[in-house]
């Protein structure tokens, strides 16, 4: 099943995997949140679980603040900070509904959370304490940090662009260019735009600069669709992760496939083998050498028998991730 460039992590979560995130400066450590109410820290090269801590409900997202501190939130409405060296935890604060997204913004040194309570909250990680609550038009489904910009995707196909240095007003209000519900948004490492995916096998490449000549460059494409018995099956695109160096990106869908795309030449660079079940989350390491792939059933067909959830660690090459020079 797995080749020499890929292996499966031992001691995976016991229920669905919600998020995988690499440590900011090394591909050695991977943080994993799960519906089994745990957050796990893995030593990837050693293929061992270093540490595990619990919430009182499913954990929907997690993020590193720095190499020794993990933040996480989920269905128990609680935002936790966990010291990965001392195994001490701190309840930082709460939302009024489940916390869907947890991200760190290094340029402004704030943690950002997005919730189904229709707010985004900023947190000062040094104290740690709440540094502001900002209303969103609908439930927050996904968010991504781009320099000092924050891109928020909500229910109702809305996209909001905020300036994390001045949250007094929304910089841009947009509507998704895709017809169906937004599943994931990730910002380009070059800070020029973002990629948005929907539940209907489509991805949009968008640019932040509102000028007409830049907006002309935006486009969308179909993906994660399979012909079965001459019928096209269309799958949600659940996960996006950017390669920090090349500005190419990987997508993962409920079809069990991972694709890597070159947004500049509008080409697919590669497709990996089919994984046992839906791709729930993806993360490139900071140096772009490693991709963590969460293969985890997302209950698209309700509670049927399904393959066990797993995290695959894949070494990726420049041939798979670098734009082809024209």
From Swiss-Prot:
Sequence positions bearing Phosphoserine: 211
A molecular-function term among this protein's GO annotations: ubiquitin binding
Keyword flag Zinc-finger: no
Primary location: nucleus
Cross-link (Glycyl lysine isopeptide (Lys-Gly) (interchain with G-Cter in ubiquitin)): 216
InterPro entries xrefs: G-protein_beta_WD-40_rep, WD40/YVTN_repeat-like_dom_sf, WD40_repeat_dom_sf, WD40_rpt
Post-translational modification: Poly-ADP-ribosylated by PARP1. Ubiquitinated by UBR5, promoting disassembly of the mitotic checkpoint complex from the APC/C complex.
Keyword Lipid biosynthesis attributed: no
Location of the protein in the cell: Nucleus; Chromosome, Centromere, Kinetochore
Domain of life: Eukaryota
Signal peptide extent: none
Alphabetical GO biological process terms: cell division; chromosome segregation; meiotic cell cycle; mitotic spindle assembly checkpoint signaling; regulation of chromosome segregation
SUPFAM superfamilies hit by this protein: WD40 repeat-like
UniProt repeat feature WD, residue ranges: 5-43, 46-83, 86-124, 128-163, 223-262
Residues bearing the modification N6-acetyllysine: 179
Gene Ontology annotations for the cellular component aspect, listed alphabetically: bub1-bub3 complex; kinetochore; mitotic checkpoint complex; nucleoplasm
Keywords, in A-Z order: Acetylation, ADP-ribosylation, Cell cycle, Cell division, Centromere, Chromosome, Chromosome partition, Isopeptide bond, Kinetochore, Meiosis, Mitosis, Nucleus, Phosphoprotein, Repeat, Ubl conjugation, WD repeat
Subunit structure: Interacts with BUB1 and BUBR1. The BUB1/BUB3 complex interacts with MAD1L1. Interacts with ZNF207/BuGZ; leading to promote stability and kinetochore loading of BUB3.
Stated family: Belongs to the WD repeat BUB3 family.
Function: Has a dual function in spindle-assembly checkpoint signaling and in promoting the establishment of correct kinetochore-microtubule (K-MT) attachments. Promotes the formation of stable end-on bipolar attachments. Necessary for kinetochore localization of BUB1. Regulates chromosome segregation during oocyte meiosis. The BUB1/BUB3 complex plays a role in the inhibition of anaphase-promoting complex or cyclosome (APC/C) when spindle-assembly checkpoint is activated and inhibits the ubiquitin ligase activity of APC/C by phosphorylating its activator CDC20.
Listed name of the protein: Mitotic checkpoint protein BUB3
């Amino acid at each position: 099943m797995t080749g020499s460039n890929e292996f499966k992590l031992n001691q995976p979560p016991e229920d669905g995997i919600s998020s995988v995130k690499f440590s900011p400066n090394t591909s050695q450590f991977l943080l994993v949140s799960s519906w089994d109410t745990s957050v796990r820290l893995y030593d990837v090269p050693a293929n061992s679980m270093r540490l595990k801590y619990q919430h009182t409900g499913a954990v929907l997202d997690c993020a590193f603040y720095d190499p020794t501190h993990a933040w996480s939130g989920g269905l128990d409405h609680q935002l936790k900070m966990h010291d990965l060296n001392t195994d001490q935890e701190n309840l930082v604060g709460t939302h009024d509904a489940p916390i869907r997204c947890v991200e760190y913004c290094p340029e402004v040194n704030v943690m950002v959370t997005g919730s189904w309570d229709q707010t985004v909250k900023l947190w000062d990680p040094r104290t740690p304490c709440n540094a502001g609550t900002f209303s969103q038009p609908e439930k927050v489904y996904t968010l991504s940090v781009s320099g000092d910009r924050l891109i928020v995707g909500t229910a109702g196909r809305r996209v909001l662009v905020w300036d994390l240095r001045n949250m007094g007003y929304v910089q841009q209000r947009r509507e998704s260019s895709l017809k169906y519900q937004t599943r994931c948004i990730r910002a380009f490492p070059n800070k020029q735009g973002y990629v948005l995916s929907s539940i209907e096998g489509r991805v949009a490449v968008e640019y932040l600069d509102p000028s007409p000549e830049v907006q002309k460059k935006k486009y969308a494409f179909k993906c994660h669709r399979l012909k079965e018995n001459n019928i096209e099956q269309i799958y949600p695109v659940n996960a996006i992760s950017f390669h920090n160096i090349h500005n190419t990106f990987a997508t993962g869908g409920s079809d069990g496939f991972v694709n890597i795309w070159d947004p500049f030449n509008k080409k697919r660079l590669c497709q990996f083998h089919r994984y046992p079940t839906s791709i729930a989350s993806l993360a490139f390491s900071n140096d772009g050498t490693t991709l963590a792939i969460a293969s985890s059933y997302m209950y698209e067909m309700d509670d049927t028998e399904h393959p066990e959830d797993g995290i695959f660690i894949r070494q990726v090459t420049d041939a798979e991730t670098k734009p082809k020079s024209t």
